[in-house]
Amino acid sequence: MSNKNKNKNIVYSDEVAFFDIETSKIKYHDEEGFELKNPIPQVYLCNVVLIKKEYLNNVNKDNIQIIREDKQEEIDDTKYQCYSYFFRTLEEFINFTKTLKNKTICYVHNLSYEFSFLIRETNNGLDDINYQNIFRGTNDCLKSFLNDIPNVEFRDSLALLGKSIKELGDEIGYPKLEIDYERNLHYYDELEDNDYDYNERDNIITLLSIADFLQHKAPSIGIKNVDKLPITSTRYVKNKRYKFAKKYFPKEFDETAVDYRNDSLDDNLDFYEISKNSFRGGLVSCNKLYMPNDNGNNWLENSCYHIDITSSYIYVMLNTKFPYYSKEKSVEVKDKNKATILIKSLAEGIEKYTSNYMNEYGINVKIDGKKIADEDIKGFYAHVTFKNIRLKNKNDIPSIDGARTSVADDKNSAKLKRFCGKVLEADELSMSLNDATLEAILIDYDFDDIECDYMIYTTESKQLPYFELCFLIGEFFIKQSFKNNKNTKRSDYLLAKSCLNSMFGIKVQDLIKDKITVKNGEVIVSEKAHSIGNDNNKKLFDEYVENNKDNKQDIYSDGVYIATKARLNLVKMKKHLKEKGCNCIYCDTDSLIFEVFGDVEEVFNSIKKYNDKITRELLRKNWIKRAIKIYCEKLKVDEKEVKDLLSTLGTWDYESVDENGNIKPYDFFSTLGPKKYCKCKNGKVETTISGLSKKIANLIEDYAKQENISLFEAAKLIFKNNTTFDETCSGQTIVTQTTLDKKFIDTLRDENNMPAKGYGGNLIEKTSFNLSILSDTESLLHSEFEFFAEKNMLTGQTVSIEKGIIKII
């Protein structure tokens, strides 16, 4: 937001509102009696709960008094009152808002859903002159002001609290109620008491959760009232870090902001774009040897183990000296010949160091016998082209994302071969990358040649500033203290865990984003960012630089480096396991599932030694020793205790363990590709299927009981390639937006010949889900493996639930 509008995002209110709607899918016919193909979602009930702002600092489930407008109830002076109002249409709610005397903050859990109805009901769109409206996307409204509802600032409580109503209710001991979702109710139908109770309960849970946040989390960022609560959990973490830094490191904090603002290339659009194009998220991939064969899935019984890194991103943030791209020490190389010589020299230098696990390499490169820099190169970004690149071991897990690359114009000549979206081989492959990504490629791939048409490198490196190192150490210390049964409150543990989970996300937030507005009852992109050749990029980037010039604490390229370095750590462990005679089966960001061939204890011992080296190298670093010392002195904490807990950071821990924590293989495991696997741990089935409900694990367990068969047999029958889970059991929904003209909707009638009382919004409907292997993966397996039978691809089955009975057809 621009400086002139810095206070646009603060509404000072006397009361706080909580709003929720209940909807049905109503079938309508037109004036000639023809029924519309699709139903229109209609509000049949909505609830508003109002409470005095100051009450939120003290209210809880035991001292709240809910007073409904339609009931006579005496005031209990020992409790905090909130007032509950019900409406049968949105029009009634909007009229109610006009009776509010002051600007009112109104929390809505998952605001985007209610917002889709509100913008259809109103006519004049957003008030973006006087207030700041915040969107994360066209389907993700975080905060809004509507011209036709001038007294209300809508906020999304889900963005701040990060949990569903059910999770929040369970957490505070005030559970969500149940209701029959299959009923289709109209705004004129008589409702049961449970309908009102259900609608109201969701708002009360949100109210109590916001109150809990205000009482237990907000004080850590110096906030005492709801007006100034952050909009998102990420903003809360940034504020918490800011308060910590200003309290314990005021001078360094201010100096860091000045340095980043005046010195960093982060305000250069070209640098931002190459760093963004080099970004690599978590590596999610699998081994093609473990995909389905002609007997079904390639199931593993009691033979695979699972390890993951303890706080992978936080480890990188603490352990790494980041290449620092300052205006003084950064050098652009635009000449293709020089850039190519440079990238070849760097690749050779990096490869020399890959066997030395923790080496912080710096590489001295000469061109035509002349040294190109006064110091070693500490890092680079480059756009490169690999010639005849291929996976070193065809049966390894590939690690180059195909979506982040391009091939020659003649795609047939490029002979790009992919598996689960990852590159296996290509005649010619172009991509943007940094030094950490190049190192990972050198571990996994061979290539005949490499060319470079652009590079920017730096001879400077820095660890994160001490205020941030100490903040991370402190949050990790709190988190591990709770896990190790130290004297730590669960609320403090949850706070610390939330902070650690958000710290990486803070670093990689896009600097330029689409501009979003509302037009004709629809959320649209008014200015698009990031598309190729888009003139808006420069305009939006300049706005970002101007608006953030006084508050620069994070460097985007650091976030890119954190992600690629964490990915590199995964690739290095994958390499280590292969050298110890293991097959890596599946990996996801910070974890590896592998099968051992040979001496299991020898593999476990090698992982222990690997971990010991990680710990030694971490605690040996001068900036870590100093950060621990500073943190312990400022926070009055025992230094040995901090070191002991910090010694687990970045180490590989076993996920496959028994009830007592002893290492054991999974009961069974199978994968159909990235984010598609089924495992059983200690008799409990778990499934991860991107886009599909976790309920599939329950479905497998229920089917085993129903058919009186083992969990393994049930899993093999249900978790199969080309299986369709229909709408009765998938848990999958699709969202479509009402687009019918308002004047046309005014002419419609329902089955009782009653008119519509609302113009619709997001229509959410249950749908089926097909569990299958990616098409490029099918083709590859077909061509490479004789055992991959064609019938395995063509035959399918459908799983459904009818009257409580699971059926497989």
Regions found by a protein language model. Give the residues of each.
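Cytochrome P450 catalytic domain signature, combining two hallmark sequence patches
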Residues: N124-R136, G173-D180, L214-I221, T320-N337, ...
